[in-house]
Amino acid sequence: MKTPITEAIASADSQGRFLSNGELQAINGRYQRAAASLGAARSLTNNAQRLITGAAQSVYTKFPYVTQMPGPTYASSAIGKAKCARDIGYYLRMVTYCLVVGATGPMDEYLVAGLEEINRSFELSPSWYVEALQYIKGSHGLSGQIGNEANVYLDYAINTLS
């Protein structure tokens, strides 16, 4: 999995050299942001159920047909609602994984690669998940550097789905 740190090391190693001052500064910057990133990951994890439930409700409010249409891809039944919450939780987990590693690698490798095909195969609308992630971004209650770190990866997921 690529992170700014592993990329700097791979570049230096492939050239048979030590890390440059610029690379060391970039790595140091990552370590300085790491505490905020871990704080954001911890908070999102601790509040996951509340955020997922609220995000699902936001989807149902914005797209009421989701709860009215029958079928396995809609939330008209308890099973459908559970699937919706599960999927929102998956996106939120990916955001927390990105926060831990300090890069979009987890999302790129585990989510983005097959996202379009999955959504098309299961007739899932990306706009549902955009709404859910926007809700989470607006409701996570994080501020300062911790909030900024969380929002970087929430925005990345939103932009990927848009």
UniProtKB/Swiss-Prot annotation:
GO CC entries: chloroplast thylakoid membrane; phycobilisome
Domain of life: Eukaryota
GO biological-process terms attached to the record: photosynthesis
Processing and modification events after translation: Contains one covalently linked phycocyanobilin chromophore.
Compartments where located: Plastid, Chloroplast thylakoid membrane
Alphabetically ordered keywords of this record: Antenna complex, Bile pigment, Chloroplast, Chromophore, Electron transport, Membrane, Photosynthesis, Phycobilisome, Plastid, Thylakoid, Transport
UniProt-listed Pfam families: Phycobilisome
Principal location listed in the UniProt entry: plastid
Binding site for (2R,3E)-phycocyanobilin: 84
Membrane topology of this protein: Peripheral membrane protein
Quaternary organization: Heterodimer of an alpha and a beta subunit, which further assembles into trimers and the trimers into hexamers. The basic functional unit of phycobiliproteins is a ring-shaped hexamer formed from two back-to-back trimers contacting via the alpha chain subunits. The trimers are composed of alpha/beta subunit heterodimers arranged around a three-fold axis of symmetry. The phycoerythrins also contain a gamma subunit which is located in the center of the hexamer.
UniProt function note: Light-harvesting photosynthetic bile pigment-protein from the phycobiliprotein complex (phycobilisome, PBS). Phycocyanin is the major phycobiliprotein in the PBS rod.
NCBIfam families xref list: phycocy_alpha (TIGR01338)
UniProt record similarity statement: Belongs to the phycobiliprotein family.
Official protein name in the record: C-phycocyanin alpha chain
High-level lineage: Eukaryota, Rhodophyta, Bangiophyceae, Bangiales, Bangiaceae
